[in-house]
Every structure is written in C-alpha cells, then in structure tokens.
Amino acid sequence: MEVPLQKSAPGSALSPARVLGGIQRPRHLSVFEFESDGFLGSPEPTASSSPVTTLTQTMHNLAGLGSEPPKAQVGSLSFQNRLADLSLSRRTSECSLSSESSESSDAGLCMDSPSPVDPQMAERTFEQAIQAASRVIQNEQFTIKRFRSLPVRLLEHSPVLQSITNSRALDSWRKTEAGYRAAANSPGEDKENDGYIFKMPQELPHSSSAQALAEWVSRRQAFTQRPSSAPDLMCLTTEWKMEVEELSPVAQSSSLTPVERASEEDDGFVDILESDLKDDEKVPAGMENLISAPLVKKLDKEEEQDLIMFSKCQRLFRSPSMPCSVIRPILKRLERPQDRDVPVQSKRRKSVTPLEEQQLEEPKARVFRSKSLCHEIENILDSDHRGLIGDYSKAFLLQTVDGKHQDLKYISPETMVALLTGKFSNIVEKFVIVDCRYPYEYEGGHIKNAVNLPLERDAETFLLQRPIMPCSLDKRIILIFHCEFSSERGPRMCRFIRERDRAANDYPSLYYPEMYILKGGYKEFFPQHPNFCEPQDYRPMNHEAFRDELRNFRLKTRSWAGERSRRELCSRLQDQ
C-alpha cells in the first residue's frame, strides 16, 4: 500500500535549494521535471508509521535520483511507476528488519525524520539556484588556447600594431560581444535557456578549393621573395624593408579582425591539403626557386661599392630586425687610398714634456744574474753523467767495454797497448798503471812502467799526499788499476782512491777524475802482449813457493782494513 507523500518545507534538510556553508549548489545536472504528486526526496509523514519505516520509504524514493531525467510527461509517469515497483520490492525484503527494530523505534531511540517538503516550492528554489550558478560561470573568463601570439584585447595596445587601421573593427566586435553578454543576462529571457552554457559550434562556410589554392600559391610566391639569410637582410633597401614588414607574421596577424581570424584559422586548410595531394606533381615556380636558388644573393658592383662592411662578430650576433645603421663599421674611412706608392704624410704632434725632463730621466737599470756555479752544477746533475769523467767536465777519452762492476769503466788489453805506444800522447800528459797484486806476484812479471801498490795506505800515500797535476788544462792524467783477474783487488783500490779524492776536494773537483780498470787483469794481458811485460813471466797468487808471504799479506790487508774501519768510526763520532 502506497503512503501519500507530504510536502517538504523549503528550509528542510532534504530541500535541493539548501545552501551548505554559504555556497550555492552549482548547476552541473539537468533540471528534472517534477510532478505535482510530490518530490523525490520528500519523506512520509511520521504519524502513520514508525521512524525506521519512514526512513526506509525515503531511501526508496531517493533511489530515483540516479536514473535518466524524463523528457516528457509520459516519461515521468513511467518513471513514477518504476519507483513504485522498486519501493514494493524493497519493502518485502526489509520487513523483517522493521519488525525487529519496532520496539527500539517506539522507545524513541532512532533518528529524527526530516520535515515535510513542498514539491512546487522545492522545484522553484532549485531552478533559482541553478540559474544563479550559471550566471557566475558565464561571468568568469577561462583561459582558452589561441593560435596567435597576442591576445585579442592586447592587439591594439601593441607598439607594433599602433598603425593598424582596423582597430575600429576590434571595438565593434568587442561591443557586439558585450551586447551578447547583456542579452544573455537580461531578466526577460526564458529561464530554461538562461542557464545554458555550452552550445554546439556552428560550421563556418568553407571556401572553395580553387580559391584556397590560389591564395596559398600567392602566399608561397610572396614568401620566396623574402631574404633567405642574414647577409640578405643586411642589403635591404627602404622599399624591401616595407615589403618584409608587410610579409611579417606579426603584421599579418595584427591586420586581421577577430571575425577574419576565426575564418583564417579554419579557412579550408583541409581542402588545401587535399588539393596538394591531387596536384603533387605540379610544383609552383616559387617553390622551385626556393629549392634551387642560392642562399646568398649576388650583388652588382655598384651595390658592392655602396655596401658598408661590418665585422664578422657583429654580423653573426646581430638581430635580423636590427637596422644596419646602428652598427659601426670597422674602418672610419670606407675607401682606402688608391695611390699606395706615395706615403701618406701624417702630422707629427709636438711632445708635451720638455726636453730637459726627458734628458733627466735615467735609464732603467738592467738586472743581471749573479755569477754562481749552482746553475751549472744543476745542469750537470740533470744530464746523463754516465758518459762523463768524475768532475763532469769532459767525456772519457779511452774506449770502454762492459765489465763486472757497472759503476766502473773497463778497457781492453788492446787499448792498454795503444796507450803504452803513445797514441794518446797529444792529449794524455801522464798515465799511471797501478798494480794491486802482492809483491811476489809483481816481481814474477808485470806490465812496463807499472807501480806496485798492494795496500790501500801505500796507494793513498803515493797518489793523494803528492797528487800528480797536469801542466795544462788541456792535458789529462789517467789512472789504470789491475790485479791478477781485475775482479776484487783492483776495483776495491779504485773505489778507495775515488773516495779519498772526493773527501780531499770540493764537489765535483777531483785530482784524478779519469780512472779505468784493465779487463781480465794481468792473466789475460800477458798471453796476448808478452812484449809489454818485464820480466816476461806470470806468477799466480796461489803459488806453492810463496804460501807464507801470501798469509802475511792477507793478515796485513785485514788489519789495515780493520784499522781503517776503526778510524772511520772514530772520525764519525768526533764529527757528531
């Protein structure tokens, strides 16, 4: 059984025109056509049923809000019938729930029912709220994407477009638009159409394809006459500048009225594309010139004489719209003198300072490097000194060979023979052959003019206490050490003399800067050159007849070595 709907008060909670937080409900839904029977959200009277039953019936009636709006009275009747079916089905499903909660509802423990609402008053209030919301939306300005770079209202304020003669069209268009808005907001208009915002755009009349193609070809030909590079812009005359300004997209966009803009944005562009596909083989003459013509325009001789040359940097970074007269030329004189044979006489300016002051000015003193050997020593140390003698002043005179010790220089027996025969007499003032063997070995056979110095103290006394000095700086003093094999005693004696020589002189000066070792010793020299030995014999160190002498000289050598080490230790302690 249907319960009759009662009218709801306009200020009730379920009234559509109720304002939440002071904001009116915007018009986002189409207006429903309500019947006089009642409003969809109006509740049932509380006297005939319990509050829970009333709330259930109210929810059944509200279920129709999600359905499609009716378009005629017949649709509204079917809509009410559908609501009745829904309410019956839901009542049967929830009868058990209402019976169980009857006791609590009678006790007054449920929600209060909303007050009744008048359907006609609710419909009128809802329409007024939607109309007010539509006026707010119409007054707001939305940012719409434009195809032009300048907005419509700012076109007449642009300094570039101040000389446009069609600004009146803009004013008339603005007035027309204002008239449309005033007519739309007038109170005498129908309320149903007053809230309407969006309208279907009307199609613009398309121009014929032949007319659009002709206009497109004329624009292409005009574009081909424009300068194609920065050098062409520099050579423009006054007439060319006017033509370029007319062809500028800014000027073209400013010279169009809003009505022309709308027609130009959609003035048969699709038709032009279709005609391009049909006439693809027919290329306009302007396009052929654009493809085949050179980028740089060739000037005549008369135009070249009138042209002012500018620096490359200024031409590269200059704006194309910048006039040529602003940039200064490189040369103040545009034409150089033709007669270069005759010197150009320039006037010499008189000096401001008097001659007396010029004469009193003293010349600036030049700074010279102080005389020092440090620079030379650094150069010597930085260079490869392995090919130089001990004081790094000269290279080795004799030809050297590889030996057992890499820090010493070795010579062959043939080089020794050349030295004995006097082949280096013009350079070598004196050479000393130091025989480091024991005395019984020396007496058994030795090289001619050799000196026997078996002990280190004997060598130090003979060579360093009274050093041999050359008579001239061009001459050299050479020392040659050897023993039986030139493997132990000869190299040790050579190092000892160099060590004492370094201690006795300031670095890098030496008494004997050039010293050699005879490779192979006396054992290798005697079989090859016995004529340069006296006596012509060879006595080895381990000879059975001289074992006692060998033992004595070894003890002396060890004691001398021990005394030397003790003396060195004492000297180091004294220095500390």
Curated annotation (Swiss-Prot):
Its EC number is 3.1.3.48. It is found in: Cytoplasm, Cytoskeleton, Microtubule organizing center, Centrosome; Cytoplasm, Cytoskeleton, Spindle pole. Stimulated by B-type cyclins. GO terms for molecular function: phosphoprotein phosphatase activity; protein kinase binding; protein tyrosine phosphatase activity. Expressed predominantly in spleen, lung, heart, brain, intestine, and muscle. CDD domains: Cdc25 (cd01530). The active site is at 483. Residues 90-105 have a biased composition (Low complexity). InterPro entries: MPI_Phosphatase, Rhodanese-like_dom, Rhodanese-like_dom_sf. One of its GO terms (biological process) is positive regulation of G2/M transition of mitotic cell cycle. Phosphorylated by BRSK1 in vitro. Phosphorylated by CHEK1, which inhibits the activity of this protein. Phosphorylation at Ser-351 by AURKA might locally participate in the control of the onset of mitosis. Phosphorylation by MELK at Ser-167 promotes localization to the centrosome and the spindle poles during mitosis. Phosphorylation at Ser-321 and Ser-372 by MAPK14 is required for binding to 14-3-3 proteins. Residues 90-119, 338-358 are annotated as: Disordered. Interacts with MAPK14 and 14-3-3 proteins. PANTHER family: M-PHASE INDUCER PHOSPHATASE 2, M-PHASE INDUCER PHOSPHATASE DUAL SPECIFICITY PHOSPHATASE CDC25. Tyrosine protein phosphatase which functions as a dosage-dependent inducer of mitotic progression. Directly dephosphorylates CDK1 and stimulates its kinase activity. Required for G2/M phases of the cell cycle progression and abscission during cytokinesis in a ECT2-dependent manner. The three isoforms seem to have a different level of activity. This is M-phase inducer phosphatase 2. It comes from Mus musculus (Mouse).
